Amino acid sequence: MMFIRMKKKGLALFAMLCAFSAVVFMNGSAYAAQSCLPSGGATIKIDDTAYMRINYQFQLYGAWRDTGSGPAGTDATTDFFFRRNRLTVSGVATDKLSYILMLEHSGDRKIAPVEVVDEAVGEFNVLEGFVIAELSDAVKFNAGKMKIPFMREILEGCFSNLSLDRSLFIYSPYQRSRDTGVALWGNLLKSKIQYIFSAMDGQESVDAPKSSPRYGGRVHLALLDPEDTYGYSGTYLGNKMVLTIGAAAQYEPGAAYSDTAAQTGDKDYTAWTADLFFEYPIGSVGTVTLSGAYLKTDFDGAYTGSNPDPGSVGLDGEKKGWYAKAGYLHQNKIGPGQIQPYVRFEKWEYAELMTGMYRQKLTWIGGGLNYLINGQNLRIGLEYSVTDFEDESDPRSKDFTTINTMLQVGF
């Protein structure tokens, strides 16, 4: 039965990929791959049209938290780890087809978003691997493993964030930030409007009631300069005047059981978000950046079951909340670089944040400073944050303070 469900899902995605491939190769093929890549890198010219480019980037963190270690778990913890450590091969195959392959090692990390784990966690995988076909500016196709076209901050370049990192609380359940599938997207009305429709794997566990693609849609309206690539920047460092309003939704039928042991209580997954991004250079003084988003993730109350699917609860499970952030880039350099102070505020409510911890609310408040020596290609960051739990009756939900430092390099 499990094999049949997986086979049906695989056939559905395969059919979409076949249709995509037919369109691509009948029409000549795609679009320059867009990602959070640095300028420069090693470029290999293949012919007058085709080329391949190699980039390397990393973010090395030094982190401190005032809890998590010692016999009682109440002593301070220090941790050095690669938040991101990437080798990327991208390029253009024809005037209509481009591609990207991204390998990443992350870790070994002990300080997690709301806890300090006993054993450091690291991972090495193919983070992204997809092709982009451009039939016109209004009709483009992505196929492969790519960023999930849902939350704006997930779609923002990982090496162009305003704050040190994106929110810890906005990831999609099961697949988090990347998923495998297809996306139809494009720009309309001189790139004032962008749309994205996607069908991706979503939940793949044998414990799911159904095996169905996760369907998604996203649209944005750019009122000033366009944001017309598959993805955004967390800050354009004063090179654009941007005011963009976006919204997105996801749906996956039969994504989770409320009781996985008895395989009862079929629950659908739905989520929606709305976001706003504003960046404006103020003459020769500097650049103001403001951004925020609301997110609601719903598994139709799966957490109330006796043995809910793990993906329907916890950090990425059923929740609602929002974040807001603001920054200011000083135009004049101090020493070899520019400074960019920022602040960030988030409020979240979880159905079940940890086992038995229901309706927990948390507030995340942080601020920091970026020192941009060579734009985003050489950046030093410092961030101080406080995570405040509304209910501290559980020993696992005590307020804590975190200090992160970051060295970011890209070439």
Spans of model-derived segments:
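N-terminal secretory signal peptides that target proteins for export/translocation
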Residues: 1-9
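Low-complexity, intrinsically disordered short segments enriched for Gly/Pro and polybasic residues
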Residues: 1-2, 15, 34, 196, ...
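Outer-membrane beta-barrel pore domains
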Residues: 35, 47, 66-67, 71-74, ...
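Bacterial N-terminal signal peptides
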Residues: 14-25
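Outer membrane beta-barrel
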Residues: 34-67, 72-227, 233-234, 318-333, ...
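Sec/Tat signal peptide C-region and signal peptidase I cleavage site
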Residues: 25-32
